[in-house]
C-alpha cells in the first residue's frame, strides 16, 4: 500500500517506464513541493539524496535504492528535525518477490528492455552495463 509514493531519478527514459505503471516520478532538478509519504532515491548522486530529504514530508520515509560511487557527506539536520525514516534497499528478500512474480502480482514486463538467450549472455551483460537499457532478461531454454 502506498499513500503518496514519489521516485526521484535522473534519467527521463527510465522514469517514463515508472510513469507508465502509474508511479509518480520526478527528476532531481524538477520543482516539487514537499509532502511525499515515501521518496525512493534512485539517482545514486549526492544531489539526489539531498533532494529526497527536501521532498519527503515530516515523519515520512526516504528509501535509498542505489549507492553513490563516491563517499557522500550528508547533512543529517533535515532528517533529524523532521523525524524522517531512512531505509536502505538493495535486493530484498527473494522468496516473497518470486512468489509475487509467479502469482502475477507485480507487472515487470515494462521494465524489461530486451530478452536474450543464455548463449548470448556476454553480450547481454555488456548491453546492460551500457546504461542504455533498464533490464535485460536471460532466457534459459529447457533443451
Give the predicted meaning of each segment:
Residues 6-8, 26, 40, 63, ...:
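Hydrophobic/aromatic beta-strand patches that form the interior of the parallel beta-sheet core
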Amino acid at each position: 500500500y502506498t499513500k503518496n509514493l514519489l521516485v526521484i531519478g535522473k534519467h527521463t527514459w527510465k522514469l517514463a517506464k515508472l510513469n507508465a505503471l502509474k508511479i509518480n516520478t520526478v527528476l532531481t532538478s524538477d520543482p516539487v513541493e514537499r509532502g511525499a509519504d515515501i521518496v525512493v532515491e534512485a539517482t545514486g548522486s549526492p544531489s539526489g539524496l539531498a533532494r529526497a530529504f527536501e521532498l519527503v514530508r515530516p515523519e515520512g520515509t526516504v528509501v535509498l535504492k542505489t549507492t553513490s560511487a563516491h563517499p557522500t557527506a550528508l547533512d543529517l539536520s533535515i532528517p533529524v528535525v523532521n523525524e524522517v525514516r531512512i531505509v536502505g534497499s538493495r535486493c530484498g528478500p527473494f522468496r516473497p518477490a518470486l512468489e509475487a512474480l509467479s502469482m502475477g502480482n507485480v507487472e515487470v514486463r515494462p521494465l524489461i528492455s530486451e530478452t536474450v538467450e543464455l548463449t548470448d549472455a556476454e553480450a547481454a551483460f555488456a548491453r546492460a552495463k551500457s546504461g542504455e537499457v533498464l533490464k535485460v532478461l536471460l532466457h534459459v531454454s529447457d533443451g
